[in-house]
Amino acid sequence: MAVDRREAALPVAAPPPTTTEHAAGAAIRQSSLWQDAWRRYMQNKAALAAAVIFVIICLYCLLVPGFWKIPGIWTSLKDYDPNAVDFSQSYAGFSLDHPFSTDKFGRDLFARVAVGGQISIAIGFAATFMILVIGVVYGSLSGFIGGKVDNGMMRFLDALYGLPYLPFAIITTQILSPSGSVSVWTMVVSLTIASWFTAARVVRGQVITLKENDYVRAAKAVGARWYRVLARHLLPNTLGILVIAIFLELPGVVLGEAFLSFIGLGINPPTASWGSIAQDGREAYRLHPEVLFIPCLAIATLVLCANFIADGLRDALDPRTRETG
């Protein structure tokens, strides 16, 4: 039997892809998206430099405290104990023994800034994590449910937005610590309560946009439960936004903790944070400006680096940037 040449020239239809092939294709697309984002981030010189400086600050805060415990590393272990008091070394100035000078009690600032950085950065990341958890839960439920529920949840957020950030954080801190003893976790919870609104609103907007996509409607059409749609189709696609949100929320939390500690409402001594070190240095900043300048410089550098990193991540993960690149 003769075969029509035109019929023979038509492409043969490929068999429909299996579920495994669908999953493999999705994994490849997701991998290429993150690879493309990484390439774009590495091309952003400002964001790359900010990331390097950010890592250096974190390593300094993590590694320097361990050196006090190793004999022979420093000239004197006592000199580099952040809580060791030696009035004969009060405001000793810059030297090899005290690279960042000393405070009024003769405590080495090189060690104290490192330990204070541990506390400030730990509070920043812990509060940011809690902010994102609350924001994801609240925002995703509000955006997915929609209707009157969404409207009511957003009006509640609007009411909270009307509260000034720092006074709200101060009041929350005082409520959680009526005795006046403020711990690290008290500070984390206080800053979380005062800061989670923006994350919730961002996640809500992303979920509202994503839930109109065909793959979400298809999942609903086949009877997928709401929590499965959220967990499998919506929340994974907000990952890029959440990564950016980490470095957008971190500066505000670090500044909030520094402000509360600077005005005497932060973590109780002898626990040091960058804000409390700056508070100690304000008494003699006219004669010894380095005691106030160094912790403030550490705060400003970390905040600027986090902002540059967030900008770089936003540019790298923005689909419109990828399309025009």
Label the predicted regions.
Residues 192, 196, 200, 249, ...:
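Alpha-helical transmembrane segments
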Residues 161, 172-176, 191, 207, ...:
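Glycine-rich helix-loop "coupling/hinge" segments at transmembrane-helix boundaries
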Residues 47-53, 119-135, 161-173, 236-257, ...:
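Hydrophobic alpha-helical transmembrane segments in multi-pass membrane proteins
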Residues 99, 103, 109, 130-137, ...:
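Generic hydrophobic transmembrane alpha-helix motif, especially the helices
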Residues 112-114, 156, 203, 207, ...:
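Short hydrophobic alpha-helical segments within the ABC transporter permease transmembrane module
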Residues 1-136, 140-141, 148, 223, ...:
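Gly/Trp-centered helix-boundary motif
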Residues 205-215, 313-320:
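Transmembrane helix boundary and interhelical loop/hinge segments in multi-pass membrane proteins
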